[in-house]
Amino acid sequence: MACQAQTTPSLQPTVTNEAVVPKLPIGTAISAAVTSVAQNAAPIPTTTAPAPTAAKSPTPAPMPVPTLKPAANAGTIVVGNNTTGIEVELAAGAGTKAVKEAGAAWIRYNGLVWADVEPNRGDRKWESQANLETRLKEAAEAGLQTILIVRGAPKWARQLESASCGPIKPDAMAYYVVFLRDMVARYSVAPYNVKYWEIWNEPDVASEAVANIPDSPFGCWGNPKDEYFGGGAYGETLKVVYPLIKSADPKAQVIIGGLLLDCDPRVAKPDKDCKPSKFLEGILKNGGGSFFDGISFHAYDFFYGKSGQYGNGNWDSVWNVTGPVLAAKTRFIKEVLAQHNVKGKYLINTETGVLCYQCQTVPVEFEITKAYYVPVTYATAAAEGLSGNIWYSLSGWQESGLLNKNQTTLAYKAYQVWSQQIKDMQFVAENTAVLGVKIYEFKRGDKRVWVAWSNDGSLRPINVAVPVKSIVDALGNPKPLPLTQIDITPLYIELEK
């Protein structure tokens, strides 16, 4: 969830409660923490939560972890249901059912708060996570793959006393890694089966930006005095936590907390400081590239007042030129990774959506735009090689929700249609044969589907040279054949075998 304004054109209207902790002296260097923890910490418990008193049901088999390809391998990543995901607020009791019925494969929760589990040094209160545990069980039973954010330092562990969202004190790091190790041991197995761990949320935010938000759901590791905005310190933390998480579960996936990437640091903006977006570079310059599996980032567009029109001025991104801002951010991340020769990392956009930012009333044009944005953002994510694209959120922020007061929106319907039409298909290529029309081709076996729309909204002539089996629009409405014109409404065009 983004917490900053953006520049836009004028159009934008263990089983025990006691944690066994290594006895490290105050001031011990972080770099010594991994060795010390490995030598002094208790063995990983072989059991997890206390067994329920009710009769036992058969233990479900662990859910397979999707094989995620590096982000550059567009064309080999299976899309459709395998990359769709939705974030759900922990208070949303019926959220799991709605995510499943939307056809999503991922569910994201924010999150597990260290301060709630260990408010006092060494004293664990896992019972504080009862609601989260219920949601994790529901997700596993529904066959959803969970991305779980871990955040929130207790007061005794904070570098900045007033900021739970900020960095951890060096002398508390040993306690943190043992907490993470025990957390993974507890929740990586049935009945929870969590495999994806996101370390903080939006760490590239300065503490000053969220100073008035108690227990901020954002991260705030950002250091304005540092050339790389504190990324090096976050990278140092990854070096410590990564081996301990892997020791608890070798299949665990450690994801850099969803980078906000507020604006493009390569483009000077007189009214905007883009130093925060150098956070990732700071991680890599400090040698953090070997201590994570994937990168999570966030990419929101802003409604520009007319159906199908949106953009993000901070990245010079607009609907009819660059498409969704996730494309610009994905390419930026790939560029930074390449500059530092870091390979084999997958990318997940863990917060996507189009916002009616600070709208007093929500026009119907926005709801139409949000619905159209679903196939556009997912097709673009596939073309850019993302391994996941998580809608924020089920209930929404700045009107981005797929539900509105527990009622489905047009965007929810569009989400279901995408899942049905592109289920388990592979992205093949972008077809550039028709001027002014975006066409992305997907394939499974001998089934071929084009996702297509007029890029600038103009009514464009189109002559499909191959036989067409059927056409439906973004909301699943059948369209007559033959197709001769196309507008801003995204279409699913299934070709004859």
Question: What is the predicted role of each segment?
Answer:
Residues 68-199, 204-229, 259-261, 271:
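N-terminal substrate-binding region of glycoside hydrolase catalytic domains
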